[in-house]
């Protein structure tokens, strides 16, 4: 029988942070023995941002849970898109990007990937 894993909010796993962005995993290889998926909540404080980065081994899907900001992308981060609660973002493997919090409260993002362990460059 396949085992279902429920991760409680006080059991989340802090991951590698990217600049001011903090990620807490709820579904991961360590927590759930996941083999093809990963899910976390990422938070960015007011007037802060993540580092510029890309993922070499996975696609990402992001849902803006609360707050607002800019999502920079493109070869030189030349594309600026406003993001806010309810927006979805698809990030292909290898796509350079950087979320920035421009709002007056914490920017909260739900992040899902198609691999349990990401490689960030």
Q: What kind of region is each of these model predictions?
A:
Residues 80, 84-85, 93-118:
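Ligand-binding loop in jelly-roll beta-barrel domains
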Residues 49, 58-85:
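A short beta-strand-loop-beta hairpin characteristic of the jelly-roll/cupin
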Residues 39-43, 61, 80, 88-90, ...:
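Conserved hydrophobic/aromatic beta-strand scaffold that supports enzyme active sites
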Residues 31-35, 45-48, 66-70, 115-118:
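Short, charged/polar surface micro-motifs in flexible loops or helix N-caps
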Residues 41, 54, 73-75, 101, ...:
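Residue-level recognition of conserved beta-strand positions in structured domain cores
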Residues 1-36, 51, 120-121:
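A short, N-terminal "cap"/entry segment at the start of jelly-roll beta-barrel domains
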Residues 27, 40-56, 93:
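Conserved short histidine dyad/triad with adjacent acidic residue
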